[in-house]
């Protein structure tokens, strides 16, 4: 029980009369429960109530009534006269209302003696204890105490002393007062923790000077934001920001400050050895002395100087870029138990003092000089930028693509110097699609330009990797010299150690395949798109370039309805004779001469693919779409063109039929097709071109079909069977023009008579 030594901080002579207003002192022996025990003829008001109401709005009419004794903890005597309610004073502090009795000045003096700056500190309810224990800012006396090193007691003015608080903040709920009416409030922390607080946060040494230093009228320093807890010290005020200016230790290193050092304040004897191990990409190490290093990837979208799993103390550390693109944070700090329970610290953390600056600077200078030979220090601004999601930044290189890696490409190929894009940095965005050798993403440059990015992985080994490198070199070489409104514009190329990025013009509406699947195509659309495709194809043929992969999926559309040829990975610039032999392309759109490995082909192969593309737009599906690719090869190899529906317009059917002639020499050129009535809109004067099924003798001299006794079909380039036998075999077969599947085809082949095969 805390005893009031006088109702005011007056002289010591009136203590006897003022003791009557206390709650049961030893001299009074219970006389405080009677008005006669006040020590004078005129009864002095005493403390009747001390209540912390939870209502935010104080109502004078309602709260001044004394009939609500059940809702408050009252220390008044039951003999209290209702007339004494006139002596009550209402004090509203902040958002809580208090009802007290007696002289206001005396109560304020009592609050000050108890170490509380407001009555709210004495009226905390048990239900609010847990939240207040964790988040409330405790009050301290207005004047600093004089601390006795012998007894650990704090003394205030007028020789008022009180023992250390009996409240343990680790308890789940506060202990009740002796009368069992209200919980006791934590007046202040225990003296040991208070002294520890002064040691760590306020002053380096304890102030114990008498005189005016402890005058209660003299203003003292403001209290800290948080008092020490039983489990340890809480986080102090934020440290001053780190100076990121260039230091004398290196152009890209952090400058050492008085309280923030790059390396620890102390260095073990094996410091140089540790740095040499870090240079060799040794994994994170932690020995008995408490020295550790942390290797983190530069791709983490966090502040590496703060979010390290080992060092969470907002202290800078050396961030070194390793050859593999990672960052090494080397911060050597001895374990210190004083920071064990800091909010963002652990056993490796240490609070730095100004006296360690010179020693740490010398240690860090030596360590950084040893690591600067093979490593470079990461820019601190770059480290802080990693807290936000950072875009993919690609460094520019001018080396030929064939020099990317000797293990990727072993074949000789012409060196291609990539063209630089018109921007410095860019970010990879939404995924748009994928192809044979890479994926396509949407990209945006720093200046706001949007484009398409073709990403290819150069780290793939084997035949596929070598083929990808050759294809990319060919595509870059062709696109660098192409500039046409109906061809996707090439913007530039960049690469890293294992990635190649090709920047192309972005067309937001996607390909023709996506367009007809989503909306369908009108006759006028097919006509307009075909004319634009022919214009771009003529531009390529005039420059001796065969596209070899014309189909709706490789033709893109912009918002204005302009179509452009794309995906030049299969394209090839032929010699002066204009022939090629490579077996490349998409099966459903390949010409018969391309399927035959012994035949050469020229620009007429693109005309066949164009006819299949126009048929695809008209029927909203690829040619031979119901067949598997091996069946498609068989049908095209035997000289069969896809069927043209009869419900199409005559001009459109004639245009497709002329493009799909099996004899490549009879196919028209791009100039001839641009003058076709389907393109010009003129009426047709002649009959529609009929598509007949040619005999196999036209291609039997260059290839053969091996029809084994099994139900499988094998297409071979070896002359293992007589052309005459194959011709008789095919002529006697009764096969529909468009079988539904390979199973249907096999069943019809098995129904053929053995006599016809023997003949």
From Swiss-Prot:
It is an enzyme of class 2 (transferase). ATP binds at residues 432-440, 454. Induction: Up-regulated in response to chitosan. It catalyses: L-seryl-[protein] + ATP = O-phospho-L-seryl-[protein] + ADP + H(+); L-threonyl-[protein] + ATP = O-phospho-L-threonyl-[protein] + ADP + H(+). GO terms for cellular component: cytoplasm; plasma membrane. The CERK1, MEKK1a/b, MKK1a/b/c and MPK4a/b proteins are involved in pathogen defense. The pathway induces rapid growth inhibition, cell wall depositions and accumulation of defense-related transcripts. This protein is required for responses to chitin and acts redundantly with MEKK1b. This is Mitogen-activated protein kinase kinase kinase 1a. It comes from Physcomitrium patens. The gene is MEKK1a.
């Amino acid at each position: 029980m805390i005893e009031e030594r006088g109702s005011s901080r007056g002289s010591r002579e009136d203590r006897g009369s003022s003791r009557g207003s206390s709650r049961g002192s030893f001299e009074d022996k219970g006389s405080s429960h009677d008005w006669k025990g006040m020590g004078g003829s005129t009864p002095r008001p005493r403390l009747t109530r001390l209540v912390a109401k939870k209502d935010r709005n104080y109502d004078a009419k309602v709260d001044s009534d004394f009939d609500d004794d059940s809702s408050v903890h009252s220390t008044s005597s039951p003999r209290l006269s209702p007339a004494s309610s006139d002596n009550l004073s209402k004090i509203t502090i902040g958002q809580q209302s208090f009802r007290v009795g007696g002289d206001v000045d005396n109560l304020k003096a009592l609050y000050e003696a108890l170490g509380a700056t407001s009555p709210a500190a004495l009226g905390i309810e048990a239900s609010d204890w847990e939240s207040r224990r964790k988040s409330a800012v405790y009050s301290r006396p207005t004047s600093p105490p004089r601390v006795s090193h012998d007894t650990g007691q704090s003394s205030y003015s007028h020789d008022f002393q009180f023992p250390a608080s009996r409240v343990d903040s680790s308890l789940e709920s506060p202990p009740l007062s002796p009368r069992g009416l209200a919980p006791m409030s934590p007046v202040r922390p225990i003296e040991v923790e208070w002294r520890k607080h002064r040691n760590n946060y306020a002053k380096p040494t304890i102030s114990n000077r008498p005189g005016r230093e402890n005058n209660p009228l003299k203003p003292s320093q403001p209290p800290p934001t948080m008092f020490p807890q039983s489990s340890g010290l809480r986080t102090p005020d934020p440290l001053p920001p780190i100076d990121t200016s260039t230091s004398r230790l290196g152009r890209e290193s952090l400058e050492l400050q008085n309280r923030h050092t790059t390396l620890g304040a102390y260095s073990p004897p094996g410091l140089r050895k540790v740095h040499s191990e870090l240079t060799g990409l040794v994994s994170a190490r932690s020995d008995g002395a408490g020295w550790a290093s942390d290797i983190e990837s530069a791709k983490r979208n966090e502040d590496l100087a703060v979010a390290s799993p080992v060092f969470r103390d907002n202290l800078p550390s050396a961030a070194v870029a390793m050859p593999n693109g990672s960052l090494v944070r080397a911060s050597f700090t001895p374990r210190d138990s004083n920071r064990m329970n800091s909010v963002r610290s652990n056993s490796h953390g240490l609070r730095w003092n100004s006296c360690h600056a010179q020693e740490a600077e010398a240690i860090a200078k030596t360590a950084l000089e040893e690591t600067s030979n093979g490593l470079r220090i990461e820019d601190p601004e770059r480290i802080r930028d990693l807290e936000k999601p950072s875009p993919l930044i690609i460094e520019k290189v001018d080396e030929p693509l064939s020099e990317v890696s000797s293990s990727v490409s072993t074949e000789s190929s012409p060196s291609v110097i990539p063209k630089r894009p018109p921007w410095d940095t860019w970010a990879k965005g939404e995924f748009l699609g994928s192809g044979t050798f890479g994926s396509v993403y949407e990209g945006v440059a720093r200046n706001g330009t949007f484009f398409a990015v073709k990403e290819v992985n150069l780290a793939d080994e084997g035949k596929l990797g070598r083929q990808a490198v050759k294809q990319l070199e060919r595509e870059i070489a062709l696109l660098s010299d192409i500039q046409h409104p109906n061809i996707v514009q090439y913007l530039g190329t960049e690469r890293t150690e294992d990635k190649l990025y090709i920047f192309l013009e972005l067309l937001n509406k996607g390909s023709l395949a996506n367009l007809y699947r989503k909306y369908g195509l009108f006759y006028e659309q097919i006509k307009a798109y075909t004319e634009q495709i022919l214009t771009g194809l003529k531009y390529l043929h005039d420059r001796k370039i065969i596209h070899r992969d014309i189909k709706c999926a490789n033709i893109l559309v912009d918002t204005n309805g302009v179509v452009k040829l794309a995906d030049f990975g299969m394209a090839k610039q032929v010699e002066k004779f204009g022939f090629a032999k490579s077996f490349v392309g998409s099966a459903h759109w390949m010409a018969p001469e391309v399927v035959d490995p012994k035949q050469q082909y020229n620009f007429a192969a693109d005309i066949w693919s164009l006819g299949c593309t126009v048929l695809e737009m008209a029927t909203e599906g690829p040619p031979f779409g119901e067949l598997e690719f091996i069946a498609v090869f068989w049908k095209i190899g035997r000289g069969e063109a896809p069927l043209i529906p009869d419900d199409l317009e005559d001009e459109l059917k004639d245009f497709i039929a002329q493009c799909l002639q099996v004899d490549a020499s009879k196919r028209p050129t791009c100039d001839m097709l641009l003058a076709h009535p389907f393109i010009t809109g003129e009426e047709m004067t002649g009959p529609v071109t009929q598509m007949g099924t040619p005999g196999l003798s036209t291609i039997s001299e260059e290839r053969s079909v091996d029809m084994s006794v099994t139900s499988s079909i094998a297409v071979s380039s070896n002359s293992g069977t007589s052309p005459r036998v194959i011709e008789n075999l095919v002529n006697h077969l009764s096969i529909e023009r468009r079988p539904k599947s390979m199973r249907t085809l096999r069943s019809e082949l098995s129904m053929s008579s053995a006599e016809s095969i023997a003949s």
